[in-house]
């Protein structure tokens, strides 16, 4: 989803053109969040959550390699089908546009076909690995750390883990490459990665505080998003758009499949309410990059102004 929508946004802005087309290349991913959030909140209006409960995923007992292979063999057919259903609408729409207007060459079609095949195989392998072992492992690690006599250790460990996990997030690297390319290197991949690591690390630290002390998510989300929206008035437009895309991208597959189960395991070990204290970690992961990337934008704006002033002084002295 992320590579497709990012490419779609860049393509549309380049076709429409204009002096500020690079400013409009980002932000589409953030807009895609509105629909799912609204849909789930509407469902919540008609759903009685008083009797809701959550059952922890247990790691399957495996005594040898044959049993491990059996677990993966059991999961493969299901995800082969699911991924095929998920990708088929995109392929169908592409074929319609190909026959109607695109008229791409045979070489380009082969290149796109190989890309779709790689995507299909990669998603099948990823989903199988995640559901067979990765998510239960996240639960187990969180529960093991939560059972330690000093629960406060969850806060720094969570922050460190969040900072490292975002580096392994594949969609983050795609966004960083797009940002560096569109801005002509003015915003480098390294700077983007540092700001995202700080943001996601802070979000996991806040999530662990919520788990330990049972703090309502609204006490974090409302001031956090309020600050993020306030910063949009003081940073260049492109930084605001990148920030909102960064938040969406940072809360990708690694966050949903490891950080969320990790938080659930820690919450269960501490005897908290998983549905109210653990869920919401992905929302915090989405929120914090909005702040860190825009703070980076303010720093960039200040440095740019200082550079311009130095150049003006140098020109005056030269004249």
Region roles according to the model:
Residues 1, 80-87, 113-116, 120, ...:
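Hydrophobic alpha-helical transmembrane segments of multi-pass membrane proteins
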Residues 1, 18-148, 152, 275-285, ...:
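Signature of multi-pass transmembrane helix bundles
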Residues 1, 78-81, 110, 129, ...:
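Transmembrane helix-loop boundary segments of multi-pass membrane transporters
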Residues 1-2, 85-86, 126-135, 162-173, ...:
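Short helix-coil transition sites and intra-membrane helix breaks within transmembrane domains
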Residues 3-30, 34, 38, 151-232:
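Helix-loop-helix junctions within the multi-pass membrane cores of secondary transporters/permeases
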Residues 10-19, 43-51, 208-210, 262-276:
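Transmembrane helix-loop junctions at the membrane interface of multipass transporters and ion channels
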Residues 31-36, 122, 198-203, 251-264, ...:
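Hydrophobic membrane-spanning alpha-helices of multi-pass integral membrane proteins
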Residues 232-261:
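C-terminal membrane-solvent junction of multi-pass transporters and transport-like membrane proteins
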């Amino acid at each position: 989803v992320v590579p497709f929508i990012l490419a779609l946004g860049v393509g549309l802005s380049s076709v429409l053109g204009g002096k500020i087309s690079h400013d409009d290349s980002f932000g589409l991913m953030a807009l895609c969040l509105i629909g799912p959030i609204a849909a789930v909140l509407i469902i919540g209006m008609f759903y009685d959550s008083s009797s809701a409960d959550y059952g922890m995923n247990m790691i399957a007992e495996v005594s040898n390699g044959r049993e491990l292979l059996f677990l993966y063999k059991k999961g493969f057919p299901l995800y082969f089908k699911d991924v095929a259903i998920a990708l088929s609408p995109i392929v169908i729409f592409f074929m319609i546009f190909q026959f109607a207007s695109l008229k791409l060459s045979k070489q380009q079609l082969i290149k796109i076909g190989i890309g779709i095949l790689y995507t299909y195989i990669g998603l099948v392998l990823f989903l199988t690995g995640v559901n067979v072992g990765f998510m239960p492992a996240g639960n187990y690690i969180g529960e093991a750390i939560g059972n330690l006599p000093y629960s406060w250790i969850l806060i720094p460990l969570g922050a460190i883990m969040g900072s490292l996990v975002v580096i392994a997030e594949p969609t983050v690297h795609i966004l960083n490459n797009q940002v560096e390319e569109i801005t002509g290197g003015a915003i480098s991949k390294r700077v983007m990665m540092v700001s995202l690591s700080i943001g996601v690390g802070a979000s996991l630290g806040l999530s662990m505080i919520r788990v330990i002390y049972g703090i309502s998510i609204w006490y974090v989300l409302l001031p956090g998003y309020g600050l993020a929206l306030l910063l949009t008035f003081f940073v260049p437009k492109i930084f605001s758009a990148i920030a909102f895309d960064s938040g969406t991208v940072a809360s990708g597959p690694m966050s949903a499949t490891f950080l969320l189960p990790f938080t659930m395991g820690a919450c269960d070990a501490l005897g908290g309410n998983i549905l109210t204290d653990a869920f919401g970690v992905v929302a915090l992961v989405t929120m914090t990059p909005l702040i860190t990337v825009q703070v980076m934008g303010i720093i960039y704006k200040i440095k740019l102004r200082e550079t311009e002033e130095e150049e003006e002084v140098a020109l005056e002295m030269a004249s």
